[in-house]
Amino acid sequence: MGSLSTILRHPDELYPLLKLKLAITKAQKQIPLEPHLAFCYSILHKVSKSFSLVIQQLGTELRNAVCVFYLILRALDTVEDDTSVPVEIKVPILIAFHRHIYDGDWHFSCGTKEYKLLMDQFHHVSAAFLKLEKGYQEAIEDITKRMGAGMAKFICKEVETIDDYDEYCHYAAGLVGLGLSKIFIASELEILTPDWKQISNSTGLFLQKTNIIKDYLEDINERPKSRMFWPREIWGKYVDKLEDFKNEEKATKAVQCLNEMVTNALNHVEDCLKSLASLRDPAIFQSCAIPQIVAIGTLALCYNNVQVFRGVVRLRRGLIAKVIDRTKTMDDVYGAFYDFSCMLQTKVDNNDPNAMKTLNRLETIKKFCKENGGLHKRKSYVNDETQSKAIFVVMFVLLLAIVVVYLKANQCK
């Protein structure tokens, strides 16, 4: 649930953590009895506990469609990510993946751990897919076809320019945003806005760029071959080879490049907020809003942080629990983006080559949040110091009281 020392430093996160633990337990008990769907929800919980949780509030039909959609794209991503699979085998599979989802006998063994289980037992996902309504099937097939073709293209092509970077992120995640929008429309719970394609694509790019940034070390250490998604147009300003950022003597250059990558990702924030504001169904809204808030929080944590090149950088579980607990309305979203933008702003070094660009971007985001949200109506996600101290005092007093009662009881004996 979280280490005791972390909870003591952030006692305001204890209650959300307990609620999250109960919600996860409840979700695990709600796995459908039907074998194919039972496998889908069970493996979804293994590959992404957070996504498994945030879709629980969706209606059954829509939840099943989103679950199957996620697993199909996760399987596609597993094929792409497995660098041990020869290119001549991998590319045809990616291109034909949209046809494999209709084949109940198809599977391809690759990946590791839970991802290998997903691939080995893919017939369960295919069977669940074939039971979805036609509108869901068509949306999922279309996105799978386009994503597979895009991934195949970048198996044989390096990410050289920022345009390449945006194109790759479109194939890897922008299409996920478009696909979810199509699924929501098919459910008749949402309607299209005139700019739905652009803003849906941006939500995917924002999430994908965040993952590419935080996963630098994991991707560069991939064997037998590194995965490299940072665009040469950015990293080439700082080093000769992308893997050089692992070297301690390149720490300053590494952090400067990291900061430019974060600043690039921030370009998508306004579209993300517009996309969330367009959603009408509360459950759909919450399932889409939580990952976006976690992304801006992750960027704030990664910015100017050399640890990205040394190990794992991720938000505290307690902070994620707080985000899940507090995200109910657009005011909450605007507040979260405002708070994390302020947090990121305090980390900007004026000597950084992109400092001015970063600060301007953050001011624009904060202004957008102020103009569109009631920031005074919500609790802060990152600045609850007074409340935290009060909770800490209460916890300390309660703990002391328990110890005193225990000691007195022993004395009586």
Swiss-Prot record:
Effect of residue 287 to F: No squalene synthase activity
N-acetylglycine PTM positions: 2
Gene3D superfamilies per record: Farnesyl Diphosphate Synthase
InterPro entries hit by this protein: Isoprenoid_synthase_dom_sf (IPR008949), Squ/phyt_synthse (IPR002060), Squal_synth-like (IPR006449), Trans_IPPS_euk-type (IPR044844), Trans_IPPS_HH (IPR033904)
UniProt keyword terms in alphabetical order: Acetylation, Endoplasmic reticulum, Magnesium, Manganese, Membrane, Transmembrane, Transmembrane helix
Name this protein carries in UniProt: Inactive squalene synthase 2
Recorded family membership: Belongs to the phytoene/squalene synthase family.
Residue ranges of the TM segments: 283-303, 390-410
Species this chain originates from: Arabidopsis thaliana
Domain of life where this protein originates: Eukaryota
A cellular component annotation (GO) from this entry: endoplasmic reticulum membrane
Subcellular location: Endoplasmic reticulum membrane
Cofactor(s) needed by this chain: Mg(2+); Mn(2+)
UniProt membrane topology term: Multi-pass membrane protein
SUPFAM superfamilies associated with the record: Terpenoid synthases (SSF48576)
Tissues of expression: Mostly expressed in hypocotyls, leaves and cotyledons, and, to a lower extent, in stems.
A GO BP entry: farnesyl diphosphate metabolic process
